[in-house]
């Protein structure tokens, strides 16, 4: 090797080591492993007590997370669940789309329940896009036009807002805080575009501009460059927790398209929604409900349209936080979980709502998908037609038929409940670190 090559090689190594050492801490990520409603908020609330910053990276107020803290139940849609911890900062990242009226309504409702000092510990990205009322009207109209083939959206305007972002005529929070004349021009332009496409929507432009002039001053104290903020925090050794909204099977790329949401709710959305490089990611925690639920339409291989489904729905109080719709219920689905683990790279798992299975004499778990000819699939189907045609192979595990609700030590769980957890762990080759047996943060059992 020539002297210059050796020098260049050493220079590369020095630069590489410098880049890898520039961050003193790693980011932990909490992701839903199914179709949402797994209990991510409770897991984030538990972990937030030990972190400095909690972030939302994608989605909007179509997400719904419930946290029970000190006997009070908080419902969050845009605010990160970690906001109940007064010692940490909450960040709404650039990948989130924000309906400001809903955000401030959510703040008021939760302040009435005891949430305090939010103005000192909430930061909103100046690059986050805005959801306007007309986006919500368009969302509802598009769903109505589909009739019986609707996608079951929350009608919160999330899809139309991301569409505006993708077609490059959306408006960012930072633009609202800049020259208001420029904001007004952009707002009039985006309204004109939507009225042209959807003539029946009615927007009082001047009234909306007056309203958003007020919102500009209300939101201004919260807004900053969150990318710089987060990178500075990592270089200073601050601990960061990211709360994924929705779930892997609702991801726009990896979910059961088109019955999905409009953002990337898998690990990739964490990076693009916060401006973080891959080497900053440490733990990736997959949250898995002990059975499977889904809100709205779309394929659901293990759905139980019978007494089992009714029991899970009733015992689990499976009502959507955002939509108030009953969730569809079915057995745990290992092929689905293997697929989302493949995409997200879970380093550990938290199983929630194990206690809902307490009364069952036996519990089924999907372990394989089969084609109509009986051939086992070695991949997760890429189309809803293929997924709709599969047959499910189940393993049958014995139940435990005793209450687990007040148990706080894994070894004190009934043997069959422990076996259920170990079965999932073995099938996925991912360690189960926590098991939830109730609503409060104290009901999460540390397995190891």
Swiss-Prot record:
<dbReference type="GO" id="GO:0004019">
    <property type="term" value="F:adenylosuccinate synthase activity"/>
</dbReference>
<dbReference type="InterPro" id="IPR042111">
    <property type="entry name" value="Adenylosuccinate_synth_dom3"/>
</dbReference>
<feature type="binding site">
    <location>
        <position position="168"/>
    </location>
    <ligand>
        <name>IMP</name>
    </ligand>
</feature>
<keyword id="KW-0460">Magnesium</keyword>
<feature type="active site" description="Proton acceptor">
    <location>
        <position position="37"/>
    </location>
</feature>
<feature type="binding site">
    <location>
        <position position="64"/>
    </location>
    <ligand>
        <name>Mg(2+)</name>
    </ligand>
</feature>
<comment type="subunit">
    <text>Homodimer.</text>
</comment>
<comment type="similarity">
    <text>Belongs to the adenylosuccinate synthetase family.</text>
</comment>
<keyword id="KW-0342">GTP-binding</keyword>
<feature type="binding site">
    <location>
        <begin position="36"/>
        <end position="42"/>
    </location>
    <ligand>
        <name>GTP</name>
    </ligand>
</feature>
<dbReference type="InterPro" id="IPR042110">
    <property type="entry name" value="Adenylosuccinate_synth_dom2"/>
</dbReference>
<dbReference type="Pfam" id="PF00709">
    <property type="entry name" value="Adenylsucc_synt"/>
</dbReference>
<feature type="binding site">
    <location>
        <begin position="436"/>
        <end position="438"/>
    </location>
    <ligand>
        <name>GTP</name>
    </ligand>
</feature>
<feature type="active site" description="Proton donor">
    <location>
        <position position="65"/>
    </location>
</feature>
<dbReference type="GO" id="GO:0005525">
    <property type="term" value="F:GTP binding"/>
</dbReference>
<keyword id="KW-0963">Cytoplasm</keyword>
<comment type="function">
    <text>Plays an important role in the de novo pathway and in the salvage pathway of purine nucleotide biosynthesis. Catalyzes the first committed step in the biosynthesis of AMP from IMP.</text>
</comment>
<feature type="binding site">
    <location>
        <begin position="64"/>
        <end position="66"/>
    </location>
    <ligand>
        <name>GTP</name>
    </ligand>
</feature>
<keyword id="KW-0436">Ligase</keyword>
<dbReference type="GO" id="GO:0005737">
    <property type="term" value="C:cytoplasm"/>
</dbReference>
<feature type="binding site">
    <location>
        <position position="327"/>
    </location>
    <ligand>
        <name>GTP</name>
    </ligand>
</feature>
<dbReference type="InterPro" id="IPR033128">
    <property type="entry name" value="Adenylosuccin_syn_Lys_AS"/>
</dbReference>
<keyword id="KW-0658">Purine biosynthesis</keyword>
<dbReference type="GO" id="GO:0046040">
    <property type="term" value="P:IMP metabolic process"/>
</dbReference>
<keyword id="KW-0547">Nucleotide-binding</keyword>
<dbReference type="InterPro" id="IPR018220">
    <property type="entry name" value="Adenylosuccin_syn_GTP-bd"/>
</dbReference>
<dbReference type="GO" id="GO:0044208">
    <property type="term" value="P:'de novo' AMP biosynthetic process"/>
</dbReference>
<feature type="binding site" description="in other chain">
    <location>
        <position position="154"/>
    </location>
    <ligand>
        <name>IMP</name>
    </ligand>
</feature>
<dbReference type="InterPro" id="IPR042109">
    <property type="entry name" value="Adenylosuccinate_synth_dom1"/>
</dbReference>
<dbReference type="InterPro" id="IPR001114">
    <property type="entry name" value="Adenylosuccinate_synthetase"/>
</dbReference>
<feature type="binding site" description="in other chain">
    <location>
        <position position="246"/>
    </location>
    <ligand>
        <name>IMP</name>
    </ligand>
</feature>
<dbReference type="GO" id="GO:0000287">
    <property type="term" value="F:magnesium ion binding"/>
</dbReference>
<feature type="binding site" description="in other chain">
    <location>
        <begin position="37"/>
        <end position="40"/>
    </location>
    <ligand>
        <name>IMP</name>
    </ligand>
</feature>
<feature type="binding site">
    <location>
        <position position="37"/>
    </location>
    <ligand>
        <name>Mg(2+)</name>
    </ligand>
</feature>
<dbReference type="InterPro" id="IPR027417">
    <property type="entry name" value="P-loop_NTPase"/>
</dbReference>
<feature type="binding site" description="in other chain">
    <location>
        <begin position="62"/>
        <end position="65"/>
    </location>
    <ligand>
        <name>IMP</name>
    </ligand>
</feature>
<protein>
    <recommendedName>
        <fullName>Adenylosuccinate synthetase</fullName>
        <ecNumber>6.3.4.4</ecNumber>
    </recommendedName>
</protein>
<keyword id="KW-0479">Metal-binding</keyword>
<comment type="pathway">
    <text>Purine metabolism; AMP biosynthesis via de novo pathway; AMP from IMP: step 1/2.</text>
</comment>
<feature type="binding site">
    <location>
        <begin position="353"/>
        <end position="355"/>
    </location>
    <ligand>
        <name>GTP</name>
    </ligand>
</feature>
<feature type="binding site" description="in other chain">
    <location>
        <position position="261"/>
    </location>
    <ligand>
        <name>IMP</name>
    </ligand>
</feature>
<feature type="binding site" description="in other chain">
    <location>
        <position position="325"/>
    </location>
    <ligand>
        <name>IMP</name>
    </ligand>
</feature>
